[in-house]
Swiss-Prot record:
Organism: Haemophilus influenzae (strain ATCC 51907 / DSM 11121 / KW20 / Rd)
Domain 4Fe-4S ferredoxin-type intervals: 151-180
Residue ranges of every copy of the 2Fe-2S ferredoxin-type domain listed in the record: 7-97
Pfam families with a match to the protein in the record: Fer2_3 (PF13085), Fer4_10 (PF13237)
Cofactor-binding details, from the entry: Binds 1 [2Fe-2S] cluster.
GO biological process: anaerobic respiration; tricarboxylic acid cycle
One GO cellular component term noted in the UniProt record for this chain: plasma membrane
Requisite cofactors: [2Fe-2S] cluster; [3Fe-4S] cluster; [4Fe-4S] cluster
Subunit structure: Fumarate dehydrogenase forms part of an enzyme complex containing four subunits: a flavoprotein, an iron-sulfur, and two hydrophobic anchor proteins.
Main location: membrane
Gene: frdB
EC number(s) per entry: 1.3.5.1
Name of the protein in its database record: Fumarate reductase iron-sulfur subunit
PROSITE patterns associated with the record: 2FE2S_FER_1, 2FE2S_FER_2, 4FE4S_FER_1, 4FE4S_FER_2
Cysteine disulfide links: none
């Protein structure tokens, strides 16, 4: 890139094997109108600092791997372009997560929260028909049939790519690392809205808990930073409505 403009890219570095604490290093990266932050990190790794660690995969904002803080805002590196910044960028790992190395964070709690809410369709147990262990083809079709209107109820919430940007944006997750978090609650709500699913009661026990929907104070920044416009804040608020219904029903129809 002869005669190209140069961006000063300040990157947080941390190797737990040799560093007592994270520190910042600055690299000069030539760029053009099409250079993404992910391209810039690749340039740094290939030509300036081979030990730089960061996550990436698809380059198309589909995999959700390259989330990081750009000038204190959660962004995907592949969707962030150097042309939109004037001379300086500060790149740090996603906020609210433990740092493993450089820009790589430990997503264990995030993954565990997603697993806990059972992010898959839970169907009814299939009864035996005519002595056969599996339901008929007609019954199978009836259990999986879905109209466009039924799909539209949850379609927006199904677009999540598990990038973790909403967790980095969430002040409540920063204060309470046990909070299920925006993405997990959104995913739970997505399946609760699916007419083919019968696992709502199992998920609501988590959403109704102390680390569920009521931990959210509705700042709304999670929806602002979402690269797929999933609107997790809306999903959480809808989850609060369902939780309130559960509470009222439990008061009117106590168990026992």
């Amino acid at each position: 890139m002869a005669n190209s403009p140069v961006m000063n890219v300040e990157v947080l570095r941390y190797n737990p094997e040799i560093d007592q604490e994270p520190h910042l290093s600055t690299y000069q990266v030539p760029y053009d109108n099409q250079t993404s932050l992910l391209d810039a990190l690749g340039y740094i790794k290939d030509k300036l600092e081979p030990s730089l660690s960061y996550r990436w995969s698809c380059r198309m904002a589909i995999c959700g791997s390259c989330g990081m803080m750009v000038n204190n805002k959660p962004k995907l590196a592949c969707k962030t372009f150097l042309r939109d910044y004037s001379g300086h960028m500060r790149i740090e790992p996603l906020a609210n997560f433990p740092i493993e190395r450089d820009l790589v964070v430990d997503l264990s709690h995030f993954i565990e929260s997603l697993e806990a809410i059972k992010p898959y369709i839970i169907g009814n147990e299939a009864p035996a028909l005519d002595g056969k262990p599996h339901p008929s083809k007609e019954l199978q079709v009836s259990r999986t049939k879905q109209t466009p209107a039924q799909l539209e109820k949850y379609r927006q919430f199904s677009m999540c790519i598990n990038c973790g940007l909403c967790y980095a944006a969430c002040p409540q997750f920063g204060l309470n690392p046990e909070f299920l978090g925006p993405a997990a609650i959104t995913m739970a709500h997505r399946y609760n809205l699916d007419n083919r699913d019968h696992g709502k009661a199992k998920r609501m026990s988590l959403l109704n808990g102390k680390n569920g929907v009521w931990s959210c104070t509705f700042v709304g920044y999670c929806s602002e930073v979402c690269p797929k416009h999933v609107d997790p804040a809306s999903a959480i608020n809808q989850g609060k409505v369902e939780s309130a219904k559960d509470y009222v029903i439990s008061m009117l129809k106590p168990k026992g």
